[in-house]
Amino acid sequence: MFLKRGFAVSLVFVFVTVFAFDFPGISFASGNENTVLVLYSKTNEEQMKDIRILETMVGQFKNDYKMMEDEEADQANLNDYEYVIYLGAGKKTLSHHMKSAIDDYKGAFYAIGHNAEQFKERLPWLDVRGEALVNQVALPKNDLVQDLSEDRIVYEVSADDAEVSGFGYKADGSGSLPLVVNEEDDYYFSGQNLYNPFGEVVTESFRLFLNDGSKGTVKYLRLEDVHPMADPELLREQAEYLKKENIPYMVAVIPVYENKDKIVHLSDSPKLVDTLRYMQENGASIIMHGYKHQYRSSETGEGFEFWDAENDRPIYQPAKDKAKQRSDFSTAEEYDEFVKKGEKYEKGYMENAIRSGVEELVAHDLYPIAFEAPHYAISQQGYRIVSKHFSSYVGQLQLTDSTWQSEYAPMHESKPDFLHGMILYPETLGYIEQGDAKAMEKLNAKIETGSKYSQSYLSAFYHPYLGLDGLKEVVKSLNEVNGDWLDLKQKDNLVQVKDIRIQTKDGGYQVEKPFLASDYERNLFIKKSLIWAIPLVLFILPAASLLVIRRRE
């Protein structure tokens, strides 16, 4: 009996060992795989904006982090984590268990915003005295003083002998107060929201808190809103200039132009297609900027596509349908049912747009390697849908489904969980607005500020219809900053739609697709074949007739 049992145990051991080594998807690692735990408190859904901002900030440093609401804290052993970050997004009395867990935690701790005064044992050096308004932030070590677009509320704190690395200047001109304070590995940020530049200040302090010594500036330029009605000659002129300057860049392409009853595809603009191919072969990375960049009756490039801007909500209905509101339903249950059906419609609508866009670009040998939502507006479900097809996302992020006017860009590339595996390459500088005489002055101010942070993206987009001279000014300003130009093709990007697979690595493309991957490509092939066939037939018929006549003679 003993021998049989020992033999059985040996078999189990061998079985487990084989599975552990032969099946990499199965892990038998002990302990928690996450090094950072982010705990947060909220009292309403509006506060999800700051929670998502924090998630985006942490995603710049760590992929292995976990988000958890304070009410779930009793389900986690905090000491499984190397770092714990707490965000008080809303004022709240914390549970005894939550406070005890923080007090007993052995690792590095960072508190942000509300409720920090409840961690008295953990932060005995922190004294929260009240509130104040600030209109500037300062990071002395970075030689940086930055104006706020509006006054912000912060907690007025004193911290005894703790180190102060960030300051705020009071709006009433009465002096400065601490924003970022720490004693050894325990930190506190006194701001009551995380919109930039507060987010940038906290990000800078995260470098010390998370022991990340990365430094450097990344620059990128994106040519925006290139659709089938764009001027190919103007675009070619800019492409040749960027090639001459040896600057890699992105081109945000919209495959279809639509305005009222006018619909133009790339197949109707062969000169533009030739220019886009030239760009792709000479430094450009193609970005899919939606499919039509419009939803209702707006012109391509002006309208939204993946957000119902008129009603400030996700795409729940076909564009031609009268938009139903909450007031159209007698009960909350009926409205919830409408929303569920709307989410199903949105999924089909977006899947169709993404598939069609990739298929049409690929049919012209144009290979998109990242996605950008028109006006950066897209629902949380939208991010899930896009992530099934693209590994890279470009621009800024919409934080919640409550409004599209809640966008955020971190300082550096990030991989927040709500992007479902996609990497964000952020746009941080904005664009040159037509008719704004101070546009370059504003851009240069942003460049100067951004370049003072330890690690940052200096990234802008430019509309080609503004001409070559304006583009040269933007490039000149960016070239004055030390840093590397981002060549997205050098990153690992993956795009998958039905039978089409596009992958980049070290600047090269790997494209897998059937000979004719879509109805669009099939029709394009027939059209091209006819163009070649008709002259050929016209030549062969007279030649054959002449040959027959000569033989009869």
Language model features by range: what are they?
Residues 37-39, 248, 252-377:
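Metal-dependent polysaccharide deacetylase catalytic core of the NodB/CE4 family, i.e.
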Residues 206, 210-215, 233, 240-259, ...:
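C-terminal domain-boundary segment and adjacent tail
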Residues 34, 81, 107-108, 125-134, ...:
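A glycine-centered loop/beta-turn motif at secondary-structure junctions
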Residues 101-104, 210-212, 237-246, 265-289, ...:
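Acidic (Asp/Glu)-rich catalytic clusters
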Residues 218-227, 344, 348-351, 355-366, ...:
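Catalytic grooves of carbohydrate-active enzymes
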Residues 539-553:
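C-terminal membrane-anchoring or membrane-association module
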Residues 40, 78-122, 279-283:
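Short alpha-beta junction capping motif
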Residues 55-80, 439-446:
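A short, well-structured beta->alpha microelement
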